[in-house]
Amino acid sequence: MTKIRIGNGYDIHQLVSDRVLILGGIQIPHELGLLGHSDADVLTHAIMDAMLGALSLGDIGHYFPPSDPKWAGADSLVLLNQVHQLIRDRGWQVGNIDSVVVAERPKLKPHIHNMRDKLAAILELESNQIGIKATTNEKLGPVGREEGICAYAVVLLLKE
């Protein structure tokens, strides 16, 4: 049996007024927030999809369908904790995470340390096991036009 598994995740949400911006479980000061059924934390969603994908367990929509009112406004860190428990129950643990958040604004670098700490606490990791990079889309496409924010994540799982 393979002792390592790798998963890839992606998420994108539209930026709108009257919502808070949450990335990696941290509220980021900005005049716009992400629209979604839950808190629309694209970074945490991409990480969850990568974790699930590594074990061929589908995606977060399967476990937390947007059609189910019980997930309305859900804190993505609560969902991440459930996905983490799902992989732990199958005998796997997270080895490391590498991720990229793509946004024209706001500048995310000042918040990356807090995001890493918040995610590490949920996943029982050291902060240095979580890489978070921030970049822009060079004003190209919907993210470049500041219509949304997206995130990519790669997760390495290790058999316990």
Swiss-Prot record:
Short name of any one Pfam family annotated for the protein = YgbB
Catalytic activity reads: 4-CDP-2-C-methyl-D-erythritol 2-phosphate = 2-C-methyl-D-erythritol 2,4-cyclic diphosphate + CMP
The record's InterPro entries line, in alphabetical order, gives:
MECDP_synthase (IPR003526), MECDP_synthase_CS (IPR020555), MECDP_synthase_sf (IPR036571)
Give the gene that encodes this protein.
ispF
The record's comment on cofactor binding reads:
Binds 1 divalent metal cation per subunit.
User: This protein is called what?
Assistant: 2-C-methyl-D-erythritol 2,4-cyclodiphosphate synthase
Annotated pathway: Isoprenoid biosynthesis; isopentenyl diphosphate biosynthesis via DXP pathway; isopentenyl diphosphate from 1-deoxy-D-xylulose 5-phosphate: step 4/6
- List the source organism: Nostoc punctiforme (strain ATCC 29133 / PCC 73102)
Task: Show the PANTHER family listed in the entry.
Answer: 2-C-METHYL-D-ERYTHRITOL 2,4-CYCLODIPHOSPHATE SYNTHASE, CHLOROPLASTIC
